[in-house]
Amino acid sequence: MAEEPTYTAEQVNDVVHAGLGTVDFFLSRPVDGQSSLGKGSVPPGITAVLTNAAELKAKTAAAAPVKPKRKKIQHMTPAYTIADNGDPNRLPANTPIANPLIPIERPPGRMTDLDLATGTVTQGTYKGVELAKAGKNALLTRFSSGPSLTDQASSKDPNFKRGGEKLTDATKADIGGSGASPGSETKLRFMSGAIQHVPQLLPLTASSPVLVEPAPIGAENVKEIIEILRGLDLRMQSLEGKVDKILATSATITALKNEVTSLKANVATVEGMMTTMKIMDPSTPTNVPVEKIRKNLKDTPVIISGPLSESHITEGSDMIVLDELARPSLSSTKKIVRRPEPKKDLTGMKLMLIQLANDCMGKPDQKAEIVAKIHAATREAQLLDIKRSIIKSAI
């Protein structure tokens, strides 16, 4: 690692004086509008000629020699005095000002000049004395090997820390002429400044080990925030899963809706066909004729215990009852002889079946065969069988 260059106090002092002389050169000269190279300062007219003239004048002013050191400028205004924070024996009695950074009334438009030997302001107000001294002391401390002025001034107070100053009392100031005195001021300066003492870090050699310490534990509220974020992440994941399930279920619901719609259409078709069949066949729904059912019926004896009521008595039935002496005897009910049912007129039904065969059957051979069967039928059951065969052939 390259060593940092060091400078003596004389070299630093020369650099500071050269800089102050340059600043004084520009501050002591009046500002001329034609020396500015900005186009905003050029009046309307021939712009190129005026700009070239301004550049020529600026080059001539830049070629002038710069004053190597700061000189005292004499003015006709009364002189003001200002004191620094150094040794008070350097100035005459009753001349220091309590705070040199406090503005002093001055005529407007005047510049500032300071005599470093006597510490007096020749004209106007000067606000940068302390700043210039502080910068000079900082340069001396950094680039010189000897002790700085700040260290020498603060060596008297062992409790002094960087950033803090001692409490100083101000005396009544004299402005060097007629006028009201500004009075006295007291500036409160703390012993311990805003920047606390920091121990200097010693340089580490190549052989010395590196000190490693565990990282500080996070604050409790940070842990709580992390836990809250994790909980929110879990809830978001669960919500995403539920949303995916809902989307999958919506597809199934759409398919079910389509199936229900098709089923409704099929049911409506079946209902229409059933209505047509009822209109065409309004007779008995069973294929068994009534006569066959009657043949299957058999007489079965029934014993009724207890008193006999008229509701149990059927006319035309053979009943044996017990009289007062418990003797069996035939009942006194009259037997009703059932008459055979009269034959129905099948002409209308035959005409309906012939018309149905003409409408539903397309082949003429089958149609002629069905019509012959209709004319040959003598019972209603035969006509019903023919009707069913016509409907089956039509489907």
Curated annotation (Swiss-Prot):
Pfam family name, one: Paramyx_P_V_C
Compositionally biased region (Polar residues): 143-157
Highest taxon in the source lineage: Viruses
Bilayer-crossing regions: none
Family: Belongs to the rubulavirus/avulavirus P protein family.
Region spans: Disordered: 143-183
The name this protein goes by in its record: Phosphoprotein
InterPro entries listed in its UniProt record: P/V_Pprotein_paramyxoviral, Soyouz_module
Annotated gene: P/V
Annotated organism of origin: Simian virus 41 (SV41)
Role description: Essential cofactor of the RNA polymerase L that plays a central role in the transcription and replication by forming the polymerase complex with RNA polymerase L and recruiting L to the genomic N-RNA template for RNA synthesis. Also plays a central role in the encapsidation of nascent RNA chains by forming the encapsidation complex with the nucleocapsid protein N (N-P complex). Acts as a chaperone for newly synthesized free N protein, so-called N0, allowing encapsidation of nascent RNA chains during replication.
UniProt-annotated stretches for the region Multimerization: 220-283
Keywords, in A-Z order: Phosphoprotein, Viral RNA replication
Biased composition (Basic and acidic residues): 158-172
